[in-house]
Swiss-Prot record:
The lineage of its organism: Bacteria, Pseudomonadati, Pseudomonadota, Gammaproteobacteria, Enterobacterales. It comes from the Bacteria. This is Protein ApaG. HAMAP family: ApaG. Not known; mutations in apaG/corD give a phenotype of low-level Co(2+) resistance. They also decrease Mg(2+) efflux but not influx via the CorA Mg(2+) transport system. InterPro entries: ApaG_domain (IPR007474), ApaG_sf (IPR036767), Uncharacterised_ApaG (IPR023065). NCBIfam families: PRK05461.1 (NF003967).
Amino acid sequence: MINSPRVCIQVQSVYIEAQSSPDDERYVFAYTVTIRNLGRAPVQLLGRYWLITNGHGRETEVQGEGVVGVQPRIAPGEEYQYTSGAVIETPLGTMQGHYEMIDENGDAFTIDIPVFRLAVPTLIH
């Protein structure tokens, strides 16, 4: 979890065995992000950047507008939650990134999302 003066980000990931195919080096993960506005004014998420790294160190960058097709506006004390997915070639990997946001005055700020793990559960003891 990371906190800024205005926003708290929490991420949980889960392995999707039914959509994965280890024999084909295809490991599917879902991740759920909760964005909480801890400030006294609304904020809006405009864009995202992800760096996805597989277990061999191969990096993939993903960036774009909004998340899951929307640019949510989050009122003070409220939260926005969404689930998305990532596919990597190894049973273990990581994701990290940032969100580009604006406050009620239109001032831009960036919220870093620290590294979190994508892992097949049987690998972690």
